[in-house]
Amino acid sequence: MDYEALKDYWTDIEDRDGIRLSWNKFPSSRMEASRLVVPIGAVYTPLKERPDAPLLQYAPVTCKPPCNGVLNPYANVDDRARIWICPFCLMRNPLPPQYKDISATVVPPELHPLNTTIEYQLPRGPRPAPPPPIFVYVVDTCQEEDSLKALKDALVVSLSLLPPNALVGLITFGTMAQVHEIGYTECAKSYVFRGSKEYAAKQVQEMLGLSQGMRPAMPNQPPQGPLGPAARFLLPVQQAEFQITNVLEQLQRDPWPVANDKRPLRCTGVALGVAVGLLETSFQNAGARIMLFTSGAATEGPGLVVGHELKEPIRSHHDIDRDNIKYYKKAVKFYDNMAKRAAHNGHIVDIFAGCLDQVGLLEMKNLSNYTGGHMLLTDSFTSSQFKQSFIRVFDKDANDNLLMGFNASLEVLTTKELKVTGLIGHAVSLNKKSSSVGETECGIGNTCAWKMCGIDPASSYGIYFEVANQGGPAAVQPGTQKGVMQFLTYYQHSSGHYHLRVTTVGRELSGPAGDPTLAQSFDQEAAAVLMARIAVFKAEVDDGPDVLRWVDRMLIRLCSRFADYRKDDPTSFRLEKNFTLYPQFMFHLRRSQFLQVFNNSPDETAFYRHVLNHEDVGDSLVMIQPTLDSYSLEHEGSQPVLLDSASIQPTHILLLDTFFHILIFHGETIAEWRKAGYQDQEGYENIKALLEQPKEDARELIADRFPLPRFIVCDAGGSQARFLLSKLNPSTTHTTGGYGGGVTSQTIFTDDVSLQTFMDHLMKLAVSGTS
């Protein structure tokens, strides 16, 4: 199968199973696996939308504990003896009586060879019905009137998008934090917490008059509906929409006076602590979202990230590198503890920032990272970027159910040839040990199960594996055996039912050492994304230069192992088609905002890394290596062009998509024509059409993206053009002149090496056999 056909085949599997593997054949020994350089890994999107997939309305057939593997197309079924053999533990299990008519031609859906992914709606049985989803809005009132009004309007609109039975609560904060008692209709009533004081969970519960609703010994059983006292603060939308709207509309700016040389006192930590404490009491393990809307940094109480005085700047990357950080470590510890509490209780924390300055996202990032919450960084709540992104959180499916799952867990089972080493994504470990757990650790490891409080159809996870076989005389025969992995995702559907989605993936094991089909099974796109996740995971704990050196070392080793070359002859270096783009991906990854913090604030870095760890292969690749399209009068429609400074031409329009920004760039001549108004004159309809085409294409790109990208239109030489220039390969710089003799392309003033120079060095090092 040629590379293009293979790529289409892998894309079809991704559409069906929501999974892409770095290697589509597994090495048969640990020694062989270590020589692959890139680990065996999967980018898995558990809730990928599949409109044609059946939803089975019965409980799955499972293997005996402790295995609990689910019946799947890779299981051996003996229809005469009415048994099936689990591929993971090789145990024989009886088929249930309703499967008595099973035969080679009559198979239940879960055994059909194409149903490698199947979803069950689990019967409720004796379990109590889960409570409806809960939304607690935590609103910052220390902001300008227009920004607060825009936020209030967005919140009022969101009420109409919630399921009628959803419970809603409101907490506002400035100098003090206030919990609004929506259930009290005589007048506006709220409980006030001092912003400078740290409250223990027990104190919050006592002050709000909430009795301990659940015994700690029952962590996995959701509670029945809203428990008495909590019903004063959390009410169903259909019952209390009028009261909630009223409270929101009457919200005023924080009345505390702010001197010109001071920041407003903002007790973000106390407000979040109260929200977590309120839900922890009565709604443990119930689907809930705490949605924080903040327009500035915490300056008061626990979790403060910057002082009250404006002359004291908020920390930068430079300050963190030099350890010049007064509040950072204490704030991180405070928010991390709160994130662990929220994750333990099954509650999601979303952070929406509407501010030109930093708000402390770096310190708070694990609130979203541990709980599967959204993170959004915008300049203001008045921006369309915030309004449209916020509304998209409440997108619904064809049955009018919210496209979000609550309280999910993901468990991985493997056959004896494979072991799972860890997961990188928005989850926390459930510390579950099994025979599938590997000896090494990559990401969140030493477990085969993880908890995701929030999960949506785009949530993707990088899951990493190692080979268990030591090799030797008993090594497997090629083509006779498959390594199989099963992913079990339990979650609370927004309709209130519990669902289980099962994906089972099997791949052949390679033959003896040096099997050429192993190299042909390499998916360079999935591999680039899996390596990017590891690099970002390392960047959170290691120094930036160390991470870049690791990326370079891995790339040199991979090329040294899989390229064709004569030793010490760089001109003989050749890569197979399914490896050729990988060095380019790594070149752009090491220049990207994920690993280069220059020109980005710590908050922006936290935001970009958060989004990378949420998206699937296609979207992650756009972030790593943006796409560039060119429009000109010579060609109809768009032409994909190289992400290179040579692509900038005076008579062309460029459309750049970096996932976070969508930019339309007018070449010098095009900009002059536009300013002269040619597009409005008769006879120049072609220029008008040329100017409109990229806008149409940009609208299509924006249509279903979350978070909504920033849209920029600029001209050659304009200040906004820097967004484009920073992403291009600098093949023409002030030191090189026109690379390849071209004089029309843009000169980029940078000391960064070009892709050509990078590749020259890579080939030289790869053929010399040194890393």
Swiss-Prot record:
GO terms for molecular function: GTPase activator activity; zinc ion binding. Keywords: Cytoplasm, Cytoplasmic vesicle, Endoplasmic reticulum, ER-Golgi transport, Golgi apparatus, Membrane, Metal-binding, Protein transport, Transport, Zinc. It is a peripheral membrane protein. Its main location: cytoplasm. GO terms for cellular component: COPII vesicle coat; endoplasmic reticulum exit site; endoplasmic reticulum membrane; Golgi membrane. Pfam families: Gelsolin, Sec23_BS, Sec23_helical, Sec23_trunk, zf-Sec23_Sec24. Signal peptide: none annotated. Zn(2+) binds at residues 63, 67, 86, 89. SUPFAM superfamilies: beta-sandwich domain of Sec23/24, C-terminal, gelsolin-like domain of Sec23/24, Helical domain of Sec23/24, vWA-like, Zn-finger domain of Sec23/24. It is found in: Cytoplasm; Cytoplasmic vesicle, COPII-coated vesicle membrane; Endoplasmic reticulum membrane; Golgi apparatus membrane. One of its GO terms (biological process) is COPII-coated vesicle cargo loading. Component of the coat protein complex II (COPII) which promotes the formation of transport vesicles from the endoplasmic reticulum (ER). The coat has two main functions, the physical deformation of the endoplasmic reticulum membrane into vesicles and the selection of cargo molecules. Belongs to the SEC23/SEC24 family. SEC23 subfamily. This is Protein transport protein sec23. It comes from Aspergillus terreus (strain NIH 2624 / FGSC A1156).
